[in-house]
């Protein structure tokens, strides 16, 4: 599943295609969304927001399209009038004079008023987004030490969108390697120095992934500035200590780590 950096880059591509352009045609697959098709024609997309792995497409008249790709959903940008042949099921079509954005295969799609947006169950449950520039390491440290999260093992905590939105498995693996911790560690047991390092890494690594145009790939990642240190590198030598990277399963997900320097 794509993680926060990939979702944000997808949102950037969608924005670049249609932001500020009048919609010339709108189509939704789901019957509960059909009443919004005609009223949206002539409106514009003002911006597209990400909250972890959810996209919020904001329209000029105040409505917001909520979508969550889950495992199979995918957005595409195409030239208007050039819808590609595919076996995927089309769910959303937002068309402008020159560009069209298409959402395939997703099933979690809603149209929200401002009041509904403010009280949406998923958005109420999800934590602050790691790509939100307003979020600071001090904020993250406070969350780590809060009663809600301080006694949680990192193997599960770093996958919990209620802690920080946008983290996923490759980020979990790379962050813990960066700070030399294991999935069994808990915030309450760390020194202040370890907490500081982890609080920074929880923001620095996702943001590096985003800014260096990362694409999820099992071999390399993050372009020239960053590559996977341990993710999908079991059996290889750790570049930090020379130990052999191992693979196990933590919180029902593959976990990669170096037992020699992650202690």
From Swiss-Prot:
Enzyme Commission number(s) from the entry: 3.2.2.-, 4.2.99.18
Zinc fingers (FPG-type): give the ranges: 229-263
Keywords for this entry? DNA damage, DNA repair, DNA-binding, Glycosidase, Hydrolase, Lyase, Metal-binding, Multifunctional enzyme, Zinc, Zinc-finger
Q: How is the cofactor bound?
A: Binds 1 zinc ion per subunit.
Which cofactors are required for activity? Zn(2+)
Recorded catalytic reaction(s): these are: 2'-deoxyribonucleotide-(2'-deoxyribose 5'-phosphate)-2'-deoxyribonucleotide-DNA = a 3'-end 2'-deoxyribonucleotide-(2,3-dehydro-2,3-deoxyribose 5'-phosphate)-DNA + a 5'-end 5'-phospho-2'-deoxyribonucleoside-DNA + H(+)
InterPro entries linked:
DNA_glyclase/AP_lyase_DNA-bd, DNA_glyclase_Znf_dom_DNA_BS, EcNei-like_N, Endonuclease-VIII, FPG_cat, MutM-like_N-ter, Ribosomal_uS13-like_H2TH, Znf_DNA_glyclase/AP_lyase
Organism of this sequence: Citrobacter koseri (strain ATCC BAA-895 / CDC 4225-83 / SGSC4696)
Protein name per UniProt: Endonuclease 8
Instruction: Provide the residue positions that the database annotates as binding DNA.
Output: 70, 125, 169
State the family it belongs to: Belongs to the FPG family.
Q: Which Gene3D superfamilies match?
A: 1.10.8.50, MutM-like, N-terminal
Which Pfam families does its entry note? Fapy_DNA_glyco, H2TH, zf-FPG_IleRS
| GO BP, sorted A to Z | base-excision repair
Catalytic positions are: 2-3, 53, 253
Q: Which GO terms of the molecular function aspect are on file?
A: class I DNA-(apurinic or apyrimidinic site) endonuclease activity; damaged DNA binding; oxidized pyrimidine nucleobase lesion DNA N-glycosylase activity; zinc ion binding
The protein's job, in short, is: Involved in base excision repair of DNA damaged by oxidation or by mutagenic agents. Acts as a DNA glycosylase that recognizes and removes damaged bases. Has a preference for oxidized pyrimidines, such as thymine glycol, 5,6-dihydrouracil and 5,6-dihydrothymine. Has AP (apurinic/apyrimidinic) lyase activity and introduces nicks in the DNA strand. Cleaves the DNA backbone by beta-delta elimination to generate a single-strand break at the site of the removed base with both 3'- and 5'-phosphates.
Which PANTHER family does the protein's record reference? ENDONUCLEASE 8 (PTHR42697:SF1)
Write down the superkingdom of origin.
Bacteria
């Amino acid at each position: 599943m794509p993680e926060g950096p990939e979702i944000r880059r997808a949102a950037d591509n969608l924005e670049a295609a249609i932001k500020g352009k009048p919609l010339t045609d709108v189509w939704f697959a789901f019957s509960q969304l059909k009443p919004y098709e005609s009223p949206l024609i002539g409106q514009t997309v003002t911006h597209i927001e990400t909250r972890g792995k959810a996209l919020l497409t904001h329209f000029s008249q105040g409505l917001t399209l909520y979508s969550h790709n889950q495992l199979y959903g995918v957005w595409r940008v195409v030239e208007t009038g050039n819808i590609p042949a595919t076996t995927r099921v089309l769910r959303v079509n937002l068309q402008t004079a020159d560009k069209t954005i298409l959402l395939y295969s997703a099933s979690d799609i809603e149209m929200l008023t401002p009041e509904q947006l403010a009280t949406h169950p998923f958005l109420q449950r999800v934590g602050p987004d790691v790509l939100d520039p307003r979020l600071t390491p001090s904020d993250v440290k406070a969350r780590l030490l809060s009663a809600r999260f301080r006694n949680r093992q990192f193997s599960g905590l770093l996958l919990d969108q209620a802690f920080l939105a946008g983290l996923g498995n490759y980020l979990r693996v790379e962050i813990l390697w960066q700070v030399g911790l294991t999935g069994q560690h808990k915030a309450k047991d760390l020194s202040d120095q370890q907490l500081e390092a982890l609080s920074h890494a929880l923001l620095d690594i996702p943001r590096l992934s985003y800014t260096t145009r990362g694409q999820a790939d099992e071999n390399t990642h993050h372009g020239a500035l960053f590559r996977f240190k341990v993710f999908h590198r079991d059996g290889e030598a750790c570049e930090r200590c020379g130990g052999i990277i191992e693979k196990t399963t933590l919180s029902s997900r593959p976990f990669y780590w170096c037992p020699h320097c992650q202690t």
